[in-house]
Amino acid sequence: MRRTINLAVIAALIITGASAEVMVSATTVESHTDGKSIGLNLWGENKHYTDDLTVNVSGLGVNGNKYHNNVTGIYALDGSQVAIDKNVNVTVVNPAPAESGEKRRPDLAHYYMSGIYAGYGGVTNDGNNDDTRITVQGNAKVDAIGVGLQANKDGYIRILGGADVKTHPLTTSDTYSALSEEGFVYVNTGMDGLKPGAKNVNMYGNIGFINKNYGIDTNPHNHGSEISLGLTTPNSKLVGGVLNEFDESNNNPHHGGLRLYLQNGATWRNEWLGAEREYPTQGRPDTANYLYTGSKVEHLIGGATEGSRGIIQAVDARPITINNYAGHTAIDYEKGAPAAENGKGEVVINHADPGSSVTLRSSVDALKEHANAEIPGLAENQFVKKIVYNGYTKGERNLGVNVHLETGVISPTLNAKLSPDDFDAAGRAMVSNKTVLSTSESEIVSGAKSALASSVMQMRADTNDLQRRLGDVRLNSDSQGVWGKYIGGKSKITDSAYVNQTYNMAQVGYDTKRGNWIVGGAFLYGINNSDYALGSGSGKTAGLAFYGAKQFNDGRYLDIIAKGNRLKNDFTVHNSLGTSLSGDYRNTGASLSLEYGKRIKRNNGFYIDPSAELILSRLSGESFDARTNTGSTVHINSDAVNSAIGRLGIGIGKEAKNSNVFLKAALAHEFSGKMKATYSMAGEPTTNSVVDLKDTWLDLELGGSWSFRPNTYVYGTFTKNFGSTVDTSYRVDAGIRHNF
């Protein structure tokens, strides 16, 4: 066996005289053999790693007549205490996994191959020890053949940060991303497993709870076996089934099992990976069933609201059983998944907290329904039978059930909202005359509509008044000027469409004095990125502008600007079931803005600035084809969008010889701004969408100009609006002007 530790660590230990059991800095441990191979092999030892820990191991679980060589990254037993202040990275390579030979015993294989193992704590054959504990303050990355995180008797594995645990399904024995055998595994859920954090957690592999009531070293069953996973971010995912031998055998007095926080778009794909666990060759002390009949979860805590719910992707045909349920969760049945078949893929909820709900999502095509989707309630009733609420039979009325059933790509979605009494005597959900049935636009249409709104938002982002474009033009003392400025910000729409857009633009211009007029032109180029409810897009815009600004001797001013823009956007949107639509389109925009105001000077350089502005614009319509990931084509025809925005503003400011600062409030109203589109495709009825931008809102603008040289000044504004359909979270204009 070859085993190495970072030389810098060894040198530090020699210089300081410290013991390796006390404190170690950044460390890399390697163990590579053709048989048994363990990176860190700790029996009753204490280790404290103040920096990152990396463990790389390779070995052979089976070699010759040896069928269970231990190939493990970190192996801690007999009350060992391992503290890792930062991150841990464990890689275990094992081309011949344990128990894969001729004389194999697959029920024991998991003992001999783990990324991180903690066990044999408390009273064992080796004496009375402390609990075995491995605590990682940072993130854990584990790539292992076998089990990712394994906690045996009185062993604790606590990952306080995020985790990326990957196992590799085997055909010779069962494998798990996390396994508990009267031990504890907490990932992103604090020291006690009850405090979900906000880190990304990805677990690729089954979850297991083994009842070691057979063979040697049986567990005393003093407490439950627990695994707590905090999947609380959109980038978090669990892939695998959940085996709980205690529930399978109807003997779980400590109510041990999986506590799963599934929130904020995190996903659990319920699909057993690799070989299922076999019955032990040594036999069990009873005739109860211990084998996997479907995932069983002790606690599932969904989102606090429907908007923050997590997602279960039901793949396995066998039922999911949730003993205690709280919050809100979506359950998706995709086309081709065994769970989508009629009578398969049930979700059984034994108890639900008040105010909790589940939302079933699928398509008529995925469910292989023979029912006519045009008959109200028929398809919904068949689908909703997948929910069994046993708490209902005991008097509970806590679980809400919703249904979203896609009837096509662009065809309307069928919706059902069950009443608290819409369950039969056995607790199976059903559609009744109390159920509220409705239809809504499909998620694909909703996404495409949002993508079309991106261009409208980009046009809106390019609007400006005199101060935002040129700063305080009274600082312009020469006949000609050049200027450049940056425009950046964030805006969003959440009413009738969902777009969250950030944009960055650059504009340069040249102008000259003609009497009391400043006339000139400008070129603009910008990019934007948009997030939709289900999808994303990006865009570019380029434009030319011609303007004239007149300054009157009494403080009045008139600003006129005409602009033409060319916009390009591309997008990909999808629905909850995996169907996506991608397309790109181009628009031409034109606008004319007129602003009239007067700076009324007061004492000590203060002034007030009432103003009125009218912005007229038109964004051309576009007809184009977008394609789905299944090869079909959706034709989209968007109408032109006409806009007329009026603004009445009042500003207060203070001017000095070389500077100006101001605060401006403006009441704005959109008199038009209706965006219409039509969607059509083969085999589905044509559908329409409308986004109405007619609205009234308040703009607040803070800015100023400063002449730091006789012929050069800088200027900038910060803008935010309130109460607008197109909500400007912030906008920053920052520029510099040079006169000559």
Regions found by a protein language model. Give the residues of each.
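Extracellular beta-strand/beta-solenoid scaffold signature
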Residues: 28-43, 56-79, 95-124, 130-133, ...
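Extracellular beta-strand/loop-rich repeat segments of large surface/secreted proteins
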Residues: 200, 204, 209-386
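Outer membrane beta-barrel transmembrane domains
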Residues: 545-550, 602, 635-740
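Gram-negative bacterial Sec-dependent N-terminal signal peptides
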Residues: 1-21, 548
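Outer-membrane translocation/initiation segment of Type V secreted surface proteins
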Residues: 21-22, 327-344, 359-511, 587
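Outer membrane beta-barrel translocator domains of Type V secretion systems
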Residues: 440-604, 719, 724, 731, ...
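Repeated loop/turn-to-beta-strand initiation elements of outer-membrane beta-barrel proteins
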Residues: 238, 516-521, 554-558, 606, ...
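Solvent-exposed, glycine/polar-rich loop segments of beta-barrel outer-membrane systems
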Residues: 496-502, 533-535, 568-586, 620-642, ...
